[in-house]
Amino acid sequence: MELSLSFPVSWLCALFTAIALYCIAVAFYRLFLHPLAKFPGPFLWKISIWPTVWQCAHGKRHLDLLAAHKRHGPVVRIGPNMLSYNTGSAARTIYASRHANVRKSDFHLTVDASVSAPSLFSIVDREKHAFRRRVVSQAFTEKAMMDASEFYLKYMKVFLDVLHDKVGTGWTKVDIQEHATWWTSDTMGDLSLGRSFNCLTEPTFRHAIPMMRNGLRYIYWAGHLPFRDLVDYILAHPILSRYGGQSAVDNRNYFDFCETAIQERIKEEQDALAAGADEESRRKDYIHYLLAAVDPETGEKLTKNELESDASLLLAAGGDAMSNAIAGIMFYLARHDFARDRATAEIRHQFASAEDIRQGPGLAACTYLEACILESMRMAPPVATSPLERVTVGNGIEVDGHWFPAGITLGVCFYALNFNETIHKDPYRFRPERWLSSEEGITAEDVQQSKSNFFPFSAGHRHCPARNLASRNLKVFIANMLWHFDLRPATSLGVNESSGEEGQTGLFCIEDALISIADGPVLEFKARLGYNASSS
C-alpha cells in the first residue's frame, strides 16, 4: 500500500519540479538572453504575457502603458517579445512606410475568427491587404463620401428633433454618448447594412449596441492569450454560443445579425440590377459601391464573405468610434467655458441657418471648432489608444536607433504619445490653441509638431479608410449641436470625470477595448433662445 501511494506522489513531485524548472529557465532567458532584454519595463511584463491579458480584460491597458512610459521613457518592454513606443518617429517608421519590414500581428486573426472571411482590419498578409484596400477605397471616393454624407444628414435631422423634444426650453440632463450612439447606429446601419436600427425613435434594436461592445471586449483580451490558436478555433465553433459566456455569445450574435442584414441588402441590389434600374435610382450606400468595386490591378471583386466582413467592420468602427469621439468633444467643451463660448460664437456667426451646416467653405472657415475637435481627440482618442501590434519580418527594422531582427512585436501607444510632454506642451491641459498658429504664443513650428505627431486614425497605408468621411461628419455634428443648443456640465459628471493618471483630474474616462468605449457624459442642454427644431 505504501508503495502504491508513494509512486504517484513521487511522479507528481517530479512533474511539478520539472514545470518549476521550465518556468525558471524561461524567465531567465527572457530577462537576460532575449533580444529585448536590455529594454526597460515592469518585471512581470518582461516574463509573461498574462499582465497584458489582464490589462485588456479590464479596459485600462492605455493607462498602464501611459504610466509605464512616464516611468521608463520612450520605449518600454510591455511583453516578453513586445515593445511599446510613445514617439511620432516610431509611429511613422512602424506604420506609415509601405516598405517597412513589418506585418500585422496574429492577434488580428482573432478579430474575425468567427466569420467566413477576414475584414480589411484583420488581414495579416500584406499583398492580400493591398488588394482589399484598393477595392474598399472605392467606397470612399469624393463622390461616394458625398453620397454617404446624405445618410448622416438624414439622421442628424432625426437626432435634433429627438433632442429638441427631450430638452424643450429648460435645462435638461442628457447622456450625450448614449444619444450619439443611437445616431451613429442608425446612420451606419442604413449606410453599411441597408437597414436602420431606428434607435433614435424606438428601443427595439438598442440591445445591439452593448452586444457589439461586449464582442469587442472579449476579442481584445482573448486575442492576447498565449494559446490564441485554440481561441480562434473555439470562436469559430458553434459550442461557443453555449459555453463561451455572454461576451462570446454577443460577439457571435452580432456577426450573425450583420450577415443576415447584408445578405438581404445584396439581394436587393442584385434584384435592382436584374430589373434594369438606372444608377441614379439606386441606393448609394456602402454595399452599392462595394458590389461595383473592381481591383484596377487584378480585375477581381470582393467575394460575398469578404463584402460581409468589411461591411460589418464599417458598422462597428464607424459607429462606436464616432459616438465616442462626440462624447469626448462634448465633455471637454462643457467643462471649458472659454472654448465652448468661442466655438459656439464662431458657429452661430458663420451660419444664419442650421440648414447651411454641411461640408463646404463655411464649415472649413470654422478653424477654432476644428481645433477643439483635434484637442479633444488628442486627450480622448476614439480609435487608436494602445499599440496596434506589428511583427518584424525579413531582415528586420530600425526604430528610433534600435535594430530589431524578424519576429519582434512592436507598436506605438498612441494614448501615451498624445500625452508626451516633449511633443505636446502641458499635455493634461485642454488647449485648442495648440493647433492654431494664429494664436498668441503659438508658432507654426509648434502646430506642425503637434500635427505631425498626431495619429487619431493610425498612420500610413493601413490607416482607417473612412477617416476623411468620419472627420467631416463629426464636424457637422458638433457644429449643429452648438448652433441649436446651449450646454453646460451637469451637477455631477459621475463616472466620466476621471482622476486620470497620477492625480490628473478632469480627463474624460475611456475604456480600451480594441477601440475606445465611453460611458456618458451626462450634460445639461437647453434649446437656443428663439430657436427650435422647426425653425432650423
Swiss-Prot record:
The family assignment reads: Belongs to the cytochrome P450 family.
Indicate whether NAD appears among the record's keywords: no
Residues recorded as binding heme, renumbered to this chain, are C464
Which residues does UniProt call coiled coil? Answer: none
Topology relative to the lipid bilayer, per the entry, is: Single-pass membrane protein
The molecule here is called: Cytochrome P450 monooxygenase fscF
Q: What does this protein do?
A: Cytochrome P450 monooxygenase; part of the fragmented gene cluster that mediates the biosynthesis of fusarochromene, a tryptophan-derived metabolite closely related to a group of mycotoxins including fusarochromanone. Within the pathway, fscF catalyzes the epoxidation of desacetylfusarochromene which opens the way to the production of fusarochromanones. The first step of the pathway is the epimerization of L-tryptophan to D-tryptophan in the presence of the NRPS-like tryptophan epimerase fscC.
Q: Give the E.C. number(s).
A: 1.-.-.-
Keywords of the record, alphabetical order, are:
Heme, Iron, Membrane, Metal-binding, Monooxygenase, Oxidoreductase, Transmembrane, Transmembrane helix
Q: Which GO terms describe its molecular function?
A: heme binding; iron ion binding; monooxygenase activity; oxidoreductase activity, acting on paired donors, with incorporation or reduction of molecular oxygen
Cellular component aspect of the GO annotation: membrane
Cofactors per UniProt? Answer: heme
Q: What is its main location?
A: membrane
